[in-house]
Structure formats: C-alpha cells, structure tokens
C-alpha cells in the first residue's frame, strides 16, 4: 500500500520583502524542489518566506525586526504597507504509479498555514485560516512528518557544499589514518 505524504502546493506572498502585492510561487515537486535563478531575482526572499512561515525569528532572517519583512519600495513611501503575509498550501498525496509525477491528492487534506507580520513588529500564525500559536502549527506539521526542529528543513544556500564536503573530509580522515 502507498503511504500518504504531505506536499507543498503554492506559496503565496503578500507584500513580503521584494514582492509587492500578491505573488504565487510554485507549485513544488512532491520529492524535491530547489530555488534557482540569477543574482537579484528574489531566490533568498522565497526561502526567507518559507523560513518565516515556519517560525524563524527576524534575526535568523538577517533582520532586526519582523516589520522589516513588509515591502517598502519607493512606490509605497507616502502610504506604507501595513503587513506582510506568507501562506503555504499543503495537501496530502498518495503515490499511484512508478513515475515521480504519478500521485493523487487525498480528498479533504488541503490546508493553509500562514504567518502575518505587522508594522508594530507583531506576528500572527494561522492554521486553516484560524489564528493559532506556533506550537499548534509545529504540532500539526509534526503529525504530517515535517519536523521543524530538524535543521535539514530546508537546506539553505551554502549548506549543500558543506554537506558534500563532510563525505570528502571523512574519506580523507579514513585514508590518512594509520593502519595497524
């Protein structure tokens, strides 16, 4: 029997960093997704949005306060935007075939997790369009097999190289170890 697993559907950004208005990112592949593009194309902001909605504090996003996530281009200088919001849509899937794209969405499994950043530096989580605590969001995701305490979710820029070097370093230690 095939197991159910969670899959990101689109990620929706509202007034988040370089994204004014509403922007939809995705959909994401069920097994593996990466964010690639030229310098300055917003890759880091997409990852920051994911980190934000999954509970990272402003300092972890290289910011002093959460209100710095709110889009602030010159176009909004006279009338600053009051909030930024990131919403991640999930659904559960069941593999149906041999191919990577052969799956069915489990009926009724769709849910949205959101986090809102306000100008007063407060933030609010939502689980299924209802206000929630971070603890409730983390418990829900944990029940679906997504562990937010695991530092491998997601793997960030620079970490891929570090991970690949671990194997090289261990191999060098092995080959350079004295033999008995």
Q: Language-model features: where?
A:
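Gly/Lys-enriched N-terminal cap/neck module of very large, oligomeric protein machines
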Residues: 8-180
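Charged, amphipathic alpha-helical linker segments immediately N-terminal to NTP-binding catalytic cores
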Residues: 1-9
């Amino acid at each position: 029997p095939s197991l159910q697993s969670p899959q990101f559907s689109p990620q929706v950004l509202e007034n988040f960093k370089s994204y004014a208005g509403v922007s939809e990112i995705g959909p994401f592949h069920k097994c593996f997704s990466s964010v690639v593009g030229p310098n300055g194309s917003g890759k880091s902001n997409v990852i920051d949005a994911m980190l934000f909605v999954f509970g990272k504090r402003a300092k972890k996003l290289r910011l002093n306060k959460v209100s710095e996530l709110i889009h602030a281009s010159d176009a909004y200088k006279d009338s600053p935007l009051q909030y930024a919001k990131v919403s991640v849509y999930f659904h559960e899937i069941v593999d149906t075939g041999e191919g990577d794209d052969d799956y069915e969405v489990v009926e009724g499994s769709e849910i949205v997790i959101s986090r809102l950043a306000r100008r007063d530096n407060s933030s609010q989580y939502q689980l299924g369009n209802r206000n929630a605590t971070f603890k409730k969001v983390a418990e829900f995701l944990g029940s679906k097999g997504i562990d937010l305490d695991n530092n491998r979710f997601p793997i960030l820029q620079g970490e891929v190289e570090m991970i690949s070097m671990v194997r090289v370093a261990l191999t060098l230690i092995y080959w350079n170890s004295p033999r008995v």
